[in-house]
């Protein structure tokens, strides 16, 4: 069996594209993967095309060998777009390898450890606060403008069966809601240490969410790269009374993150932007996180499983970084089923209504859980006709 053709297609995912890689073989098997090129990596399809040319005529079942060769070919430019491109190619080859063996991907890695994956609703309220017009007109979902809206959102999360939900810093005022992202601007602004007014706004946000959800919903709070370690520490101490399941924070220094972990009164989740075991190892050695977040489209599921094994050796649980589209949900599910040290699976519950129409078989999601697909490969292919009905045309 040899790789014959490689191509990308892109579907409308609302505020970002859903990008899919298709690898066809001369044996009639086709492999798929999803990758993310919309927010930070606009040239990723071109990098994939250039690297994929090197695997034409090769056997996709030797995915580990192919990935090693591709990584060697970009030795002087590791990580970044090159790593993401290699992961996209490898993930599609793994889909083919599992289909050729007649097994689900998790079985290819010796699993599944579990067939039902616990979920959390990611960015709960965050995109409604940022893109109120789109959510109201296109998705038919209410805007998020007031603390009362935040309270109603907490009740909605529980009504939709979620037991865990994650939100981001949102400030409410008479002008509406503002999604706070101070870390996504140039420089190291002193404001990222957070003043009292910002902390009070965040505290009020989480209080409203808790009031609406009740005592049994686990709340995760994601501040991302938004603060200095000092600011993250202030958030952690201020939000202690809300019994967070974790605080999510990212800094580039293993030592600084480890110090922060020792100063906040709740578990710390982090590391979603790292590549490969070598990228994670300094953080594991420093004891920098309670939960290591691993991006399957960026790393490839094979390397993600290896990262999870390294985390397990340091007594650390893992969770997939998964704010992507429909096929990435399946990829994340197979990762979650392939490792013993799973914490929980991320999913976007506020998404376009045609999301799972883009798959040939929709996943089963109910009562805060995701059922692992049973069919060979990822368990579904990309529905190319549906993609054609919802093309990405926003650049």
Task: Name every feature range the model reports, one short phrase each.
Residues 1-32, 36-37, 352-356:
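Structured beta-strand/loop patches that form or line metal/cofactor-binding pockets in enzymes
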Residues 3, 28, 51, 89, ...:
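Conserved, mostly hydrophobic/aromatic
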Residues 51, 65, 237, 243, ...:
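Shared catalytic-loop signature of beta/alpha-barrel
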């Amino acid at each position: 069996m040899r790789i014959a053709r490689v191509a990308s297609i892109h579907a409308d995912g609302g505020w970002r594209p859903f990008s899919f890689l298709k690898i066809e073989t001369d044996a009639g098997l086709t492999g798929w993967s999803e990758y993310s090129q919309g927010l930070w990596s606009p040239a990723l399809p071109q990098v994939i095309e250039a690297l994929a040319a090197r695997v034409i005529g090769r056997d996709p079942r030797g995915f580990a060998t192919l990935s090693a060769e591709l990584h060697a070919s970009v030795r002087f430019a590791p990580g970044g777009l090159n790593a993401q491109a290699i992961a996209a190619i490898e993930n599609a080859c793994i889909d083919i390898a599992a289909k050729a063996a007649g097994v689900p991907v998790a079985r290819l890695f010796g699993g599944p450890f579990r067939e039902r994956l616990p979920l959390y609703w990611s960015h709960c309220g965050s995109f409604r606060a940022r893109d109120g017009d789109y959510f109201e007109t296109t998705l038919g979902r209410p805007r998020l403008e007031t603390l009362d809206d935040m309270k109603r959102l907490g009740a909605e999360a529980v009504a939709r069966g979620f037991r865990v939900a994650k939100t981001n810093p949102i400030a409410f005022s008479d002008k509406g809601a503002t999604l706070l992202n101070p870390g996504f601007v140039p420089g190291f602004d002193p404001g990222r240490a957070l003043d009292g007014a910002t902390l009070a706004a965040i505290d009020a946000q989480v209080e409203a969410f808790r009031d609406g959800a009740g005592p049994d919903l686990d709340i995760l709070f994601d501040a991302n790269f938004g603060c200095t370690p000092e600011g993250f520490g202030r958030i952690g101490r201020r939000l202690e009374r809300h019994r967070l399941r974790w605080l999510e924070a990212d800094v580039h220094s293993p030592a600084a993150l480890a110090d922060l972990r020792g100063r906040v009164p709740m578990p710390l989740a982090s590391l979603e932007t790292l590549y490969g075991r070598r990228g994670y190892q300094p953080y594991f050695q420093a004891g920098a996180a309670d939960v290591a977040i691993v991006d399957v489209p960026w790393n490839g599921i094979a390397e993600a499983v290896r990262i999870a094994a390294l985390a397990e050796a340091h007594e650390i649980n893992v969770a997939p970084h998964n704010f992507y589209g429909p096929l990435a949900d399946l990829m994340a599910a197979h990762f979650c089923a392939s490792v013993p040290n799973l914490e929980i699976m991320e999913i976007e519950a506020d998404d376009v209504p045609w999301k799972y129409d883009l798959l040939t078989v929709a996943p089963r999601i109910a009562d805060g859980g995701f059922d692992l697909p049973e069919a060979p490969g990822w368990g579904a292919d990309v529905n190319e006709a549906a993609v054609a009905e919802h093309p990405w045309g926003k650049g």
